Amino acid sequence: MFRYQVLIEYIGTNFVGWQIQSKGKSIQKEIQVKLSKFLKEKVVLIGSGRTDAGVHAIEQSAHFDCKKEIQNLDKLLKSINHFINDKGISVLAIKKRSLKFHARHSAKQRIYKYIIFNRLSKPSLEKERGWHIIKKLDIELMKKGSKKLLGTKDFSTFRASSCNAKSPIKTMKSVNIKSKDGRIEIQFKSQSFLQQQVRSMVGSLKYLAENKWDLKKFEFVIKSKKRILCAPPAPAEGLFLEKVIY
C-alpha cells in the first residue's frame, strides 16, 4: 500500500463543502472520482478537516492510499486538473508520504483567514471572496478583542449546535488582524477548530468593532460558554483555509 498527500486550492461557492454528502457537489467527491478513474482502483480521499458550504481553500491538505506506486505524479496532477479546473478546483501538488502520515491526525496547526471589505462599494474582482460591510469598523478595538481569544479555553460560545467535536476546549495560538484600504484580513491559528468557530468569532469581533458590544461584554460572551449569546456567524464566503502545518 502506498500513501500520497494532495494539496488543493478551491473556490467553495458552488459546493456543499469539502465532505461528500447525499445531495450536492463536494470537493472531496470531485477529486476522489477522478483519482479512482485514473488510478483504476477505488480510492478514498481523507481531508485535514471539513470546510463548510461556501468556504474556500488556499491550501487544503488531504491523503489517499493506493495499491500500486504512482510512477509519474506530474502526469497524474495534470490529468486531474484538466477535468476539475473549470469547476473551481486546482490540485497544487501530489506527494508520496509515509503510511504514518495522516492528513487530519498528523496536523500540528491549521491556519484560517477571514476577509472583510469595509467600504462603500462591493468588491468585483473578489466577488464572493469576502464579507462586505459598509459601516466603518474600529480596527483597534477589534485587535484588542482578538487578544481575549488567545490561549487554551472553552470555546462553546462559538460552537455550532451540530458540532460533533468531543471537547470544546481549544488552544488559540494566534489571531492577527491587518487592515489596508478597506480590506481587513483576520488570521487564526490553532491545532484544530470547532464547527463554525472561526465564523462565529469573526461575527462577534464585528459586533465589537461596530460598538454594539464593549470589551467587557465581549469577554463576558466568551466566558459564558452559551451559544445563544454569540453574535450571528460571519458568512461563509469570506472564510479561507489558508494552510495546514505538519
Swiss-Prot record:
Pfam families (alphabetical): PseudoU_synth_1
EC supergroup of this enzyme: isomerase
Binding annotation for substrate: 112
Catalytic activity: uridine(38/39/40) in tRNA = pseudouridine(38/39/40) in tRNA
Enzyme Commission number, as recorded: 5.4.99.12
GO molecular function: RNA binding; tRNA pseudouridine(38-40) synthase activity
CDD domains the UniProt entry points to: PseudoU_synth_EcTruA (cd02570)
Entry keyword set: Isomerase, tRNA processing
Residues annotated as catalytic: 52 (nucleophile)
Origin: domain of life: Bacteria
Biological process (GO), any one: tRNA pseudouridine synthesis
Subunit relationships: Homodimer.
Function recorded in the entry: Formation of pseudouridine at positions 38, 39 and 40 in the anticodon stem and loop of transfer RNAs.
Family: Belongs to the tRNA pseudouridine synthase TruA family.
Protein name as it appears in the record: tRNA pseudouridine synthase A
Biological source species: Pelagibacter ubique (strain HTCC1062)
Taxonomy of the source species: Bacteria, Pseudomonadati, Pseudomonadota, Alphaproteobacteria, Candidatus Pelagibacterales
